[in-house]
């Protein structure tokens, strides 16, 4: 029979252990486990040796891959746009880099990698949803993502854009994938007292349109990303993670690629800049972000830069 003294000792021990167990579980929950990489960070490497680059990314510790288009099945207008811009970029490879979706899937599987999302152009979303979704299903990708959209002259233009996105999203659902919009800092300046990006979020069906937040470009657009994460819970499902060497803003409305290029020198590896990443990523988890994807656009020192960002992400512990 247990004495009163032993009972109290056992009870006290059990009570003391509860917070320790809880803290252990919380520590695990606050980690970002499967960090991804947007391949636009290292376009020349994947163009030169796709399989070898996937092996390198896996060895570094990345778990998820995000592709950028166009693809062999993409709409001609998207291919023509890509052909027009690549000479200034110094590379031309995109999509699956000459491989089929099945071949890519095999390479990813061999390296323990997955591909939750594919970036693609607007015309492909409107005209080639069938083959796009088919490739997504082969890879196991859930999201097809529009990386940017045209700036509109007025709120009526943004209303029409929102309605178009809603229709694209409904078509994506019919094909078994989900549509997301990466606004690239566009639509954040108020027009007649209304922020176009907020109009798009609120005018679209949450089942038809999700969002990919790029914390650098959204900050450059002058908004508080934490406020948006808290306000629109469940809408941001993917996030591009990078840092800002110093606090900078677009020279205009953020809708012009030239404005993006102006800020490239201020991109830096996660954890080495001025953004409060622990705060942002903690709110992102609570908001419903599923995939945290490192992006260092055209990384100057690819392997070094990607290692640095991943090390920071893996060591990060997020607040409650």
PLM features: residue spans?
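N-terminal pre-domain/capping segments
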Residues: 2-143, 311-320
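Active-site acidic/histidine proton-transfer and metal-coordination neighborhood
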Residues: 11-13, 18-19, 94, 111-210, ...
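Hydrophobic faces of well-ordered beta-strands that scaffold small-molecule active sites
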Residues: 33-38, 65-67, 115-120, 144-146, ...
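Acidic-and-aromatic substrate-binding clefts and catalytic sites of carbohydrate-active enzymes
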Residues: 42-48, 69-77, 92-98, 121-128, ...
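Alpha-helical scaffolding segments of alpha/beta enzyme cores, especially the outer helices
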Residues: 52, 56, 99-106, 130-138, ...
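Acidic/histidine-rich catalytic cores of soluble enzymes
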Residues: 172-271
């Amino acid at each position: 029979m247990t004495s009163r003294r032993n009972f109290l000792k056992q009870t006290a021990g059990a009570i003391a252990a509860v917070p320790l167990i809880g803290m252990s579980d919380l520590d695990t929950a606050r980690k970002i486990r499967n960090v991804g990489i947007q391949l636009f960070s290292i376009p020349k490497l994947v163009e030169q040796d796709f399989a070898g680059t996937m092996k390198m990314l896996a060895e570094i510790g990345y778990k998820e891959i995000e592709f950028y288009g166009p693809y062999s099945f993409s709409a001609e207008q998207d291919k023509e746009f890509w052909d027009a811009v690549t000479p200034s970029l110094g590379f031309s490879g995109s999509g699956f880099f000459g491989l089929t979706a099945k071949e890519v899937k095999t390479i990813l599987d061999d390296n323990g990698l997955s591909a939750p999302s594919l970036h693609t152009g607007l015309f492909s979303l409107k005209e080639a949803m069938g083959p796009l979704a088919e490739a997504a299903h082969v890879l196991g990708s859930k999201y097809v993502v529009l990386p940017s959209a045209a700036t509109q002259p007025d709120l009526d233009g943004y209303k029409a854009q929102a309605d178009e996105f809603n229709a694209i999203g409904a078509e994506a659902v019919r094909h078994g994938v989900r549509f997301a919009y990466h606004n690239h800092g566009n639509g954040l300046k108020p027009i007649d007292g209304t922020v176009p990006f907020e109009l798009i979020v609120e005018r679209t069906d949450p089942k038809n349109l999700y969002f990919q937040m790029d914390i650098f470009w959204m900050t450059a657009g002058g908004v508080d990303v934490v406020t948006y994460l808290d306000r629109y819970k469940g809408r941001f499902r993917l996030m591009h993670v990078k840092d800002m060497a110093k606090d900078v803003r677009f020279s205009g409305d953020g809708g012009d690629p030239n404005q993006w290029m102006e800020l490239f020198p201020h991109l830096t590896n996660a954890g080495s800049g001025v953004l409060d990443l622990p705060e942002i990523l903690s709110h992102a988890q609570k908001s419903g972000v599923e995939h945290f994807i490192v992006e260092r656009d055209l990384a100057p020192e690819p392997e070094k830069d990607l290692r640095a960002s991943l090390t920071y992400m893996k060591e990060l512990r997020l607040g409650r």
